[in-house]
Amino acid sequence: VTRAWRAPAPADAQELDPGAVFEAGLRNHHVSNTAYPIAHGRTWAPYRVAAEDAAAVAVDAWAGIDDLCLYVHIPFCETRCSFCEYTVVKREEAPGVGEYMDDLRRELALYRAALGTESRRLHGFDIGGGTPSFVPAEQIASVVEQARSAFLFAPGADISIETTPRIAAAEPAKLEAYRRAGIERISMGVQVVQPDLLRLLNREANGIACHRQAVENIRAAGFARFNVDLMYGFAGQGLESWRATLQHAIDLGPEYVTLYRMRYKLTRISHQAAEVTLEQVRPLAALAKHMLADAGYTANPGKTTFSRLAGDVGTSSYLARRVQDGMPYLGLGLGAQSFTHTTISYNDGAVGKNLFPYHRSLERGRLPLQDLYDLPLAQMAGKMCAVSFYFGEIRTGPFRAKFGRELEEVYPAAVDLVLRQGLMRRTAGALSLTPAGAEQVNGVIALFFAPSVQRYLVERDPDGAEDLHRNRAASLRVAGEAALA
């Protein structure tokens, strides 16, 4: 497919020394990860589309895209966990659940009318948050039904949803309703099991007391694809406490276990990042890989989801198609991100994290776009490569199909370095991390970022940088302006 990307800004036309970039990624390991881009207010500023043009550019960007995935964001939670970096609204806004779900349906209807979605094939559908299971089950079922009528579901496409242990244990009827609606995969956030750490993270209500009942209810509802999320890399998290968390998760018997390293950026505990070094994190990751392997869970080096089912990658089809194929995805809901071949956009609420601007846009019958970026190949390829590291490899066929160029042609110096230093190797249809590369993934991943992002990393001082911390003043200003508009 021939595509036209906009010309890069001067900052994305430069070439940096790959060795310096690799070292900068390791040095800035808390931000050099799959959460691409970094400092987008600076690195993506040249590509921001004027607000009055955003809707037209968004619709044009979807032209010719027949295969995509869908993500629906539910921003409500019982409590906000201290480690959360996502778009979650305050508990005081919970009474607005009904109105918000109406807005979601309005947004999907707008895209259906603008894009003619009925002829487009959906390859995966994730319902995330927040805590999707916080809202009434009939609201979830209604959104699923609307999505089924708006798109063609491709063979193999599944629907996945997230829950907390407490809700899964206390509200089994919700789980049964999800299965009736056709949701096949469920993910439960265990994260950690130590009481002191749960208290620190504001997750005491989701302690181990409710886990067994939660799993019983999940199985009784008919879920045969069950994932448990765990987190590591917290300040003060020792090897033995992590071992206990891993063993507990294994004993719950899920089909999949997904490991998330704590990223700190924009969280309530971002100030603790300085206490966590790579030397502390690596033994935790190694222990997890060994314990999960001994229990029958496998993953190639660097992959974050471990599966005990042969031939099953373990993730939802939404994430698999995003990561492995760079497939476009449409994001609905507060602050949701959408990705085409040439653009990335963020919905209203991505900054202020309040419902009003999102609701106002939909009430006025317009797409709720806060920011839309028309990006050059260097940035779109950087995004695709960055998320590929969820699976520990970059698939060369999908890269070629998307960009019309070989991976080695776009990244000659990066590919040379990772092969020469044994950080990645050529496998069937992919450039894959080696065990050594997985240990140094923060450096490896930076080699595939766009030059402006690499420059930012090279110049960034991890001890003095403020980008880990949410600019609260800016967030409040955006929220205030939205309320007055």
Could you tell me what each predicted segment is?
Residues 77, 255, 429-430:
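Beta-strand-connecting loop/turn residues
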